[in-house]
């Protein structure tokens, strides 16, 4: 049906036949193609409220770095981010204690981290160093970690420097000395690798050193004024924390598991995590490679299990709207099932703004990924707490976007609960401020009209019913809820519940507009309709021919326009279709006569006659300036030609004077069935919604579907 905000115009496109009696479930769904408010656009702005996610095959951005060995995996990861680094850092493949503090320094030096065997320079690593051709090679750890023989071999590829220490704690302090000045430091246990590498990307991003400590004894460090302790008191004891507090302010980030720890770091430090590196939290080499990659890409690291994503990590990917994943290691580290589960959906940021556009014939979620011809975005669960805004208009439930006519994005609001669909329709078909009984009558008419379309997709336009998504109003919600399931039937079958804005004081019979005569859609006087009046003027002379050089029409054809050009485009289209089928274009020079004849059962003008003089430009570029025709059509057809928003009904008369025609009319719309303004007046007079429906649809029964 049709809605024009203050004044409502309704039309019916369906064939008026009795609808067979069918049983409809109260929880039936309906889908809506969004055209009315969205229009035809090549880009749409999306903004979710609550939890919405993109779903489908491989919708997230994913990459996996998996070699046959840790050396190859490190090589693959380094190749993805570095081309010709000035420095390469080398660590022992197994002795994790050397590598724990190195990531912040690697970030400072913009250096990849590679593995080697202790006594032999691993061939894969050697080839990678040769490829990078660095000026400097930095060895981490003493000769027991990486031998002098390896060091000597490395000298053929660049200047070699070694950072070592008599123990892991001194080594971390010596690495910290290479960081320059800093106002904050990270203190972690030196007994396990997960705590230090979990915080490493954050520390690297801010230039904070990572200092190792024993659980119950803090080495003699010169600490800055701010310290972050990573891990619970089982990793770094309360006594160590209290010792640090004597000189520094302390923030502790605990975690009951390694998986929870990486999540807590992101949450407590309020880090952006739309892109993350995922590693198996039990595998040192994968975690070190992941920490190096994350620090280079300014992303975060999350630990997962081989066959599952722990709840803490899932919570981060949801709350932080993670859409890009780098997986470290083969499927023996992180299974294909885990990768696929993350690849096949990702959450959008609550309150975030995204731009969906067409790029080279495909849908592109800007700054995220390019897809195919469709993309589905759905809420975590259907709820008014989860909403999605499309170009500023909110909708509930799932929206599927597809490319239409190769150039437009067409959203479909999928599987809306039918009664919620009505809540989005009623305030767009009748002002929500009107009397509740009028709104209830409107609701029953709208429900009856659309209930047979459950399980299908309908438009949100006046071609069916205007659906405004989550444009709910408490008053219209009440009307829907208080009439839940109520419909109109005639002899046991659903009726075609036509309605219009105003009938002008007389309802129209269905057979006067459509081919079918329906016993409950009859012509009769309506004393409650306010008989809304309107006028429309059309000038007799449409082109100022005195100012035109009629001998040279090509000089003015493209610039000359009719006085009422906006209202005559349909008339010109009729001429091109019915009279001048091979012409390029026509112009209306004058309207020489306009009249209406015949009267319908509903007191409306049956036939319209318009005599026009027009000019023709042929497809070959020749002109004819002496054409005349009389257009004789049903008045409803002329109304469509001129425009139903200005030629508001066929309940009309015409007055002629020397310069113009004045069409005077009553009502707005076809006049069949219920008058919305009439329903308003009847409700204000005290009529119940059932009485209103009984008047406009005589012989019908108000019942449940």
From Swiss-Prot:
Function: Possibly involved in cell wall metabolism during spore formation. Enhances the amidase activity approximately threefold.
Induction of synthesis: In stationary phase; under control of SigD. Repressed by LytR.
Chain segments carrying region 3 X tandem repeats: 64-349
Stored Pfam families: CW_binding_2, SpoIID
Sequence repeats: 64-161, 162-251, 252-349
Listed NCBIfam families: SpoIID_LytB (TIGR02669)
Location in or out of the cell: Cell membrane; Secreted, Cell wall
Database matches in InterPro entries: Bact_Sporulation_Assoc, Cell_wall-bd_2, SpoIID/LytB, SpoIID/LytB_N
Listed GO CC annotations: extracellular region; plasma membrane
Annotated keywords: Cell membrane, Cell wall, Cell wall biogenesis/degradation, Membrane, Repeat, Secreted, Signal
Keyword Transmembrane tagged: no
Residues annotated as signal peptide: 1-25
An annotated GO BP: sporulation resulting in formation of a cellular spore
Protein species of origin: Bacillus subtilis (strain 168)
UniProt key word Flavoprotein: no
Membrane topology: Peripheral membrane protein
Protein name per Swiss-Prot or TrEMBL: Amidase enhancer
Taxonomic classification: Bacteria, Bacillati, Bacillota, Bacilli, Bacillales
């Amino acid at each position: 049906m049709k809605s024009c905000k203050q004044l409502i115009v309704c039309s019916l496109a369906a064939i008026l036949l009795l609808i067979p009696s069918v049983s409809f479930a109260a929880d039936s769904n309906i889908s809506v193609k969004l055209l009315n408010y969205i229009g035809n656009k090549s880009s749409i702005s999306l903004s979710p409220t609550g939890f919405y996610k993109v779903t489908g095959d491989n919708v997230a951005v994913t990459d996996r770095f998996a070699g046959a060995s840790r050396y190859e995996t490190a090589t693959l990861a380094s190749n993805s981010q570095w081309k010709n680094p000035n420095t390469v850092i080398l660590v022992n493949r197994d002795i994790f204690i050397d590598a724990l503090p190195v990531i912040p320094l690697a970030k400072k030096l913009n250096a990849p981290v590679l593995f080697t065997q202790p006594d032999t320079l691993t061939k894969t690593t050697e080839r990678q160093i040769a490829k990078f051709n660095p000026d400097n090679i930095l060895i981490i750890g003493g000769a027991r970690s990486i031998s002098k023989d390896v060091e000597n071999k490395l000298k053929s590829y660049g200047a070699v420097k070694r950072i070592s220490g008599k123990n892991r704690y001194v080594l971390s302090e010596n690495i910290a000395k290479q960081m320059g000045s800093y106002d904050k430091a990270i203190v972690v246990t030196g007994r396990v690798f997960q705590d230090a590498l979990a915080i490493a990307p954050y520390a690297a991003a801010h230039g904070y050193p990572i200092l190792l400590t024993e659980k119950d004894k803090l080495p003699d460090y010169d600490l800055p004024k701010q310290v972050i302790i990573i891990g619970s008191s089982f990793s770094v004891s309360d006594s160590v924390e209290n010792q640090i507090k004597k000189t520094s302010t302390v923030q502790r980030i605990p975690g009951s598991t390694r998986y929870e720890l990486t999540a807590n770091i992101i949450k407590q430090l309020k880090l952006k995590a739309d892109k993350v590196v995922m590693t198996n939290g039990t595998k040192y080499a994968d975690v070190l490679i992941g920490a190096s990659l994350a620090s280079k890409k300014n992303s975060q690291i999350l630990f997962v299990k081989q066959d599952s994503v722990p709840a803490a990590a899932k919570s981060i990917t949801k709350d932080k709207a993670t859409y890009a994943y780098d997986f470290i290691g083969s499927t023996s580290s992180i299974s294909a099932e885990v990768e696929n589960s993350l690849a096949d959906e990702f959450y959008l940021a609550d309150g975030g703004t995204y731009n969906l556009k067409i790029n080279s014939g495909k849908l592109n979620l800007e700054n995220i990924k390019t897809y195919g011809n469709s993309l589905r975005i759905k809420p975590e669960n259907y709820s008014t707490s989860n909403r999605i805004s499309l170009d500023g208009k909110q909708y509930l439930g799932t929206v599927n976007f597809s490319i239409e006519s190769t150039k437009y994005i067409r959203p479909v609001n999928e599987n809306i609960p039918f009664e919620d669909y009505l809540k989005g329709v009623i305030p767009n078909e009748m002002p929500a401020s009107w009397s509740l009984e009028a709104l209830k009558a409107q609701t029953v008419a709208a429900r009856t009209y659309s209930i047979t379309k459950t399980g299908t997709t309908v438009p949100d336009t006046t071609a069916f019913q205007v659906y405004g998504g989550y444009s709910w109003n408490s008053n219209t919600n009440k009307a829907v809820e208080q009439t839940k399931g109520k419909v109109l039937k005639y002899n046991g079958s659903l009726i075609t519940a036509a309605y219009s804005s105003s009938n002008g004081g007389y309802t129209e019979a269905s057979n006067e507009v459509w081919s079918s005569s329906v016993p409950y859609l009859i012509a009769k006087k309506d004393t409650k309709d306010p008989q809304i009046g309107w006028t429309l003027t059309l000038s007799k002379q449409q082109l100022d021919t005195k100012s035109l050089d009629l001998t040279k029409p090509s000089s003015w054809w493209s610039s000359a326009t009719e006085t009422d050009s906006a209202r005559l485009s349909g008339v010109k289209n009729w001429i091109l279709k019915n009279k001048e089928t091979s012409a390029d274009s026509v112009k209306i020079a004058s309207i020489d006569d306009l009249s209406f004849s015949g009267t319908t059962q509903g007191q409306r003008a049956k036939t319209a006659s318009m005599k026009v003089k027009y000019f023709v430009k042929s497809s070959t570029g020749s002109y004819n300036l002496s054409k005349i025709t009389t257009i004789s059509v049903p008045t409803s057809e002329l109304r469509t030609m001129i425009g139903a928003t200005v030629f508001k009904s066929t309940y009309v008369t015409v007055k002629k004077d020397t310069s113009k025609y004045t069409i005077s009319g009553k009502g707005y719309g076809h006049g069949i069935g219920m008058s919305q303004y009439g329903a308003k007046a009847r409700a204000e007079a005290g009529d119940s919604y059932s009485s209103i429906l009984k008047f406009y649809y005589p012989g019908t029964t108000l019942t449940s579907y």
